[in-house]
Amino acid sequence: MSSALPDVSVTDLAPSLSPLQWVGMQGIDLPVRIQEPTYQRELHARADVQVDLPAPHVKGIHMSRLYRLLDAWGQAAAVSPASLFALLQEMIDSHQDCESRSARVRLDFDLLVRRPALVTEGLSGWKSYPVHVLATKVGGALNLSIEVRIGYSSTCPCSAALSRQLIEDGFLRTFKDQPLLEVSAVAQWLRSNASLATPHSQRSEARVRVTVPADAPDLGLLALIDHVEGALRTPVQTAVKRADEQAFAALNGQNLMFVEDAARRIQASLHGYRDSQVHVRHLESLHPHDASAWSAPQAAAPDQQESFATGNER
């Protein structure tokens, strides 16, 4: 019995002599460490790793090499621009016999963050933020982007105005024959009738993608999330008591917004970030469909804008 195992990726020729843009694996389970100034945690991620295959005569790449490099990287390094770019170079170096010159890594995971209640001291709960990290080295150029998804509440300004009109009409009907009103009577009427009509509101989602500088010490995930939530002002809550629910109702009333308002708020707040792209979606309670808006720098390539808009970034 021969001791040498066959390797057809080396001994066989490709049936069609053509280069391939990317070859590799998707959805590899991997523990990753996130270490940022205000966040340190090990999380479960799914990773995609690929290299290019420019040599038309080579039948296939060495996927086990990529897997082992990724596995070793996950054990040895926290996720950072420096560690990701080092991994990309190792992937390229491991495929010199395939003439590979480019590599990319994508990580998908949920950033778990403990969030305090708005008012009640000592009350908090966990909130999950889906994160996508994409690092590439193509033609010697390094690029790293992060994308976060943030849930928030949106209340329709038009619906709020219509509701106020109905409440006003009800008030006038009740007190039209009373030129002088007691404050207590008005207060009593409001307690019973201020919800005569209520504006529609809904859970909403913001997707924000930015480019991370190659020399950044970390990805800045939580900083970006906090930044966007601060711009929106109505992030969904975790654990609440009645006082927190009341405070949340006040925030929604003070921050009425169409989907266009939400997108503009976020984009205007991202002036310190590079290549920012925004997609917001309001899961309408009035309609069976969603309202959406996108925002991207004018300089962004059309294909990049399209992939972000359609969610086809893979």
Swiss-Prot record:
<protein>
    <recommendedName>
        <fullName>GTP cyclohydrolase FolE2</fullName>
        <ecNumber>3.5.4.16</ecNumber>
    </recommendedName>
</protein>
<feature type="site" description="May be catalytically important">
    <location>
        <position position="156"/>
    </location>
</feature>
<dbReference type="GO" id="GO:0003934">
    <property type="term" value="F:GTP cyclohydrolase I activity"/>
</dbReference>
<feature type="compositionally biased region" description="Low complexity">
    <location>
        <begin position="291"/>
        <end position="304"/>
    </location>
</feature>
<comment type="similarity">
    <text>Belongs to the GTP cyclohydrolase IV family.</text>
</comment>
<dbReference type="Pfam" id="PF02649">
    <property type="entry name" value="GCHY-1"/>
</dbReference>
<comment type="function">
    <text>Converts GTP to 7,8-dihydroneopterin triphosphate.</text>
</comment>
<feature type="region of interest" description="Disordered">
    <location>
        <begin position="290"/>
        <end position="314"/>
    </location>
</feature>
<dbReference type="InterPro" id="IPR022838">
    <property type="entry name" value="GTP_cyclohydrolase_FolE2"/>
</dbReference>
<feature type="compositionally biased region" description="Polar residues">
    <location>
        <begin position="305"/>
        <end position="314"/>
    </location>
</feature>
<comment type="pathway">
    <text>Cofactor biosynthesis; 7,8-dihydroneopterin triphosphate biosynthesis; 7,8-dihydroneopterin triphosphate from GTP: step 1/1.</text>
</comment>
<dbReference type="InterPro" id="IPR003801">
    <property type="entry name" value="GTP_cyclohydrolase_FolE2/MptA"/>
</dbReference>
<keyword id="KW-0378">Hydrolase</keyword>
<dbReference type="GO" id="GO:0046654">
    <property type="term" value="P:tetrahydrofolate biosynthetic process"/>
</dbReference>
